[in-house]
């Protein structure tokens, strides 16, 4: 541990062996709170490399139980969170809609730290059992194309280090790791990051982890694709990373103000979700969610481009099938 800290104090990247050793010690609770705080801050100041992030994720995955084998190319749209803008839960609503369209969504997530409602909070408030056992999860997934993996159930190191990380008053490597350690190891990911500078780093980390197809995005300072500002994207395609910007025009949608997406409390988040699924949501809410679903359809080769993905999503919402689909997920999660 001393050598690892010394390397970080001298602004040196850790090699693979050092990262694996460090995170094994963290998992085994052999790192003191003072040492963990020092490591996280030193990594933050140095700047985490994509290799450090990917090896840390691999180590955490090696120690996480895998609930079941699906045999499918699974999709996740878990983001880092941490943008602090308190918007509706775009990614979770998008995952529910995408699964109602037949995409195999293995949604990894946790409770909110900086927003009114994280993915776990929203689903729980909707009535979904967020702590499904492996049998329930597999059954729910097979019958609905949707499964929620509550991160603290699979990664105790996240749960146990949470109080210390909160006291640091800064984002750490743990924020980056959250979207990378889904125990079902999805091969397709739409990953939102809280800072534009992380897009390329996280895309490289996904590539190193063996993800086949991905898009890492930051839209106007949020960890989502947005319509009120430019969304910066790094797309992993054919083992190459393409970097570009997206605007509302790329989705054939009008722009909307960020304020229209912001909510005051968790209750508003639930109502926004239900309204969208029943095709009676505010245009600003429905359209930004449609843009995110479109990206999932595009990454999954279900839509030839983003505009077609939006058109498919909006037509599907007219049927109100996503609302009935949510009721099915709620029922299956408690079965």
UniProtKB/Swiss-Prot annotation:
Chain residues that bind Mg(2+) 1: 91, 224
Residues engaged in binding 5-phospho-alpha-D-ribose 1-diphosphate: 79, 82-83, 87, 89-92, 107-115, 119
Binding locations of anthranilate 1: 79
Organism superkingdom: Bacteria
Protein's name according to its UniProt entry: Anthranilate phosphoribosyltransferase
Pfam family, one: Glycos_transf_3
Enzyme class: transferase
Gene3D superfamilies, alphabetized: Nucleoside phosphorylase/phosphoribosyltransferase catalytic domain, Transferase, Pyrimidine Nucleoside Phosphorylase, Chain C
Cofactor note text: Binds 2 magnesium ions per monomer.
Cofactor(s) demanded: Mg(2+)
Biological process, per Gene Ontology: L-tryptophan biosynthetic process
Signal peptide stretch: none
Gene that this sequence comes from: trpD
Keywords: Amino-acid biosynthesis, Aromatic amino acid biosynthesis, Glycosyltransferase, Magnesium, Metal-binding, Transferase, Tryptophan biosynthesis
Residue positions binding Mg(2+) 2: 223-224
Quaternary structure, from the entry: Homodimer.
